[in-house]
UniProtKB/Swiss-Prot annotation:
The organism of origin for this protein: Xenopus laevis (African clawed frog)
Broad class of the protein's primary localization: cytoplasm
Covalent lipid adducts (S-farnesyl cysteine), residues: 588
Gene: palm3
Family recorded in the similarity comment: Belongs to the paralemmin family.
Source organism phylogeny: Eukaryota, Metazoa, Chordata, Craniata, Vertebrata
Composition bias type Basic and acidic residues, residue spans: 306-317, 349-383
Descriptive protein name: Paralemmin-3
Length: 591
């Protein structure tokens, strides 16, 4: 403490006398420089005396560390030995004689002198230790403190070696224990969990912060393994196998999988259900594609594109036709109730592929499905922006209005006479392409007629009872339909009719004559004629039945002129019948 006080006092005096940043020659000129040099000499003597004391008191404990620590001091004191400090030099040489360290210092100058080619009493590499010596001179107390601390550590090691050995032994054995646990339980899926629970019971603080992370990892891997191997093997046919696995874990109260249940259940259900619907749709679409490609005429290439829009529901049109005639009077009374019902999933209809079985068993089911689809789609229809899905669902509604034309004997006779006329093929094809460009729903209805004709050709013997039943239904419903159309026409004359509704009526009236071609032809010869001449005659009938299809057919529907009678195809229906068709179509659109 006295040395530190003297040093601080000298520094303060120097700063006061010479300034904070003294010039390089000011230290030599200042009177305090002599006092500082004396302080440094006294510090060095103290260090040497303290080291000798330590060696004499406990030589066995200090020797291993004293060798490593005192080499710079010995080198520095050898340097000062040439400076004229004789007493210090004798003490240091006596200490070197006791240590074997002095032999190393005697050998070093000879080798380095040979390398350098100089024979100097103070070799050049030893000059590198001079800045360390200056640091020691500047901070002698720190040096002494470090030496005392190391001596105390040596004493502690000698006093309690058993604790240190146990600590080192535990640190060495920790990785081995981990390896043993992991090697034993690689096949077992809960090995790390068991090891962690043992460490928690023992209170091992080092592994506690890893517990949650490792537990979640192990449970996720365990769940993925079980989901990959046993879940797929046992429950390939069952859709809810993974859900059963999760419920078993919940019953066992496995806390590790608790936070994963909801997420995985939602993912699995979302992944399982849409795949079923997609597979059913793909099957029905593939079968319908094969039937269409085998039996379509090659003259009309654009029909294949439009037929893909109405694939799903054209499979079931045969039985739906009969049901629609039955339910037409019942629909208009119950539209307000059924508008707010939810649509049944569309996957119900594609699964029912056999029209024969539908006629016998599934009449009531198809009634409900068809009525809900018709009324919901008519309520939600936008006449200018019709998506393909709505077009495919509105086909049944277009068929519904086919019952109006059954009450008209003139339309029936003309529709039967159309395929028999000797019409040229080139204007018919031009008409079909123009109508396809104008509205895609026309080609959908052509595809409907083709599929119905194919079904009739396949059924063969079942055609006659169906056609007879349809004739009876048409006769029964003709009177009711005329009355309802008159009543609804009065209501619609009061309400303003926009151009968009009239244009949708045209597209919806164009499907009127298509069912008559097939359902009224009970003879198989006439059926074959209708199936052969059907695409051409149906396009002409569609273009001729609506108003405004005569002159500007190349233009879109929004720009068609209204009020001109059709001149192509020879269909000369009266204006009153066409007005009645228009008004029934308006009713459906408004409802």
């Amino acid at each position: 403490m006295s040395l530190q006080q003297l040093k601080r006092k000298s520094l303060r005096d120097g700063w006061l006398m010479d300034g904070v940043v003294p010039s390089p020659g000011a230290e030599i000129d200042s009177p305090l420089f002599q006092t500082e040099s004396k302080i440094q000499q006294l510090e060095k003597e103290l260090e040497s005396l303290q080291m000798q004391q330590l060696r004499l008191e406990n030589p066995a404990a200090v020797q291993p560390e004293a060798k490593a620590i005192q080499t710079p001091f010995l080198n520095g004191e050898k340097i000062q030995q040439g400076g004229g400090q004789a007493g210090d030099a004798k003490e240091v040489t006596a200490g070197q004689a006791n240590n074997t360290h002095g032999i190393i210092h005697e050998e070093q100058p000879t080798k380095e002198d040979q390398d350098m080619g100089t024979v100097l009493p103070i070799p050049a590499p030893r000059g590198k230790t001079v800045p360390k010596e200056d640091e020691n001179q500047a901070n002698p107390e720190l040096k002494v403190d470090m030496e005392h601390q190391k001596v105390e550590l040596v004493d502690l090691i000698q006093e309690c070696p058993v604790e240190n050995q146990t600590v080192e032994h535990v640190e060495k054995n920790k990785p081995h224990l981990d390896q043993e646990h992991t090697e034993k339980n690689q096949d077992g899926q809960h090995g790390i969990l068991e090891f962690l629970t043992q460490d928690q019971q023992l209170g091992n603080p080092n592994l506690q912060h890893l517990d949650r992370y490792l537990i979640t990892e192990v449970t996720v891997k365990h769940f993925e393994k079980n989901q990959a191997h046993p879940g797929q093997e046992k429950n390939q046919d069952e859709q809810h196998g993974i859900l059963k696995y999760l419920t078993q874990d919940q019953q066992n109260e496995n806390p590790n999988l608790g936070h994963l249940d909801q997420y995985l259940i939602t993912e699995i259900t979302l992944q399982s259900n849409p795949l079923e619907n997609i597979s059913v749709h793909d099957q029905t679409q593939s079968t319908s594609d094969q039937n269409m490609e085998t039996k379509l005429p090659t003259d009309i290439p654009q029909q294949k594109e439009s037929q893909s829009e109405g694939k799903i529901q054209t499979k079931d049109q045969g039985p739906e036709f009969e049901l629609l005639y039955k339910d037409h009077s019942h629909e208009k009374g119950t539209t307000d109730q059924t508008q707010h019902q939810e649509l049944l999933p569309s996957s119900i209809e594609p699964k029912e592929e056999n029209p024969k079985a539908q006629d016998e068993k599934l009449d009531h089911h198809n009634e409900s499905v068809s009525t809900v689809h018709e009324q919901k789609e008519v309520h939600d229809m936008d006449p200018r922006q019709l998506s393909t899905h709505q077009k495919s669902l509105s086909i049944s509604e277009d068929q519904n209005q086919g019952s109006v034309s059954l009450s008209d004997p003139q339309n029936q006779d003309q529709s039967l006479a159309l395929p028999e006329k000797g019409l040229e093929e080139t204007p018919q094809l031009n008409l079909s392409h123009e109508v396809q460009c104008e509205e895609p729903s026309l080609m959908e209805q052509i595809s409907i007629s083709l599929l119905q004709s194919m079904e009739q050709n396949q059924e063969g013997a079942d055609q006659t009872p169906k056609s007879v039943a349809l004739e009876e239904l048409s006769e029964l419903l003709s009177s009711d339909m005329i009355k309802q159309s008159v009543l609804l026409s009065k209501n619609l004359e009061e309400s303003p009719s926009t151009a968009s509704t009239e244009e949708t009526q045209e597209t919806m009236c164009q499907a009127v004559i298509i069912p008559d071609l097939k359902k009224e032809n009970s003879d198989p010869e006439v059926v074959q004629e209708s199936s052969s001449h059907e695409p051409m005659s149906s396009t002409i009938a569609q273009s001729s039945s609506a108003e405004g299809n005569s002159s500007p057919e190349s233009r879109p529907l929004l720009q068609k002129s209204q009020g001109t009678d059709s001149q192509q195809g020879g269909n000369t229906a009266t204006q009153q019948e066409e007005r009645r068709k228009k008004k029934t179509c308006q009713c459906c659109v408004v409802m």
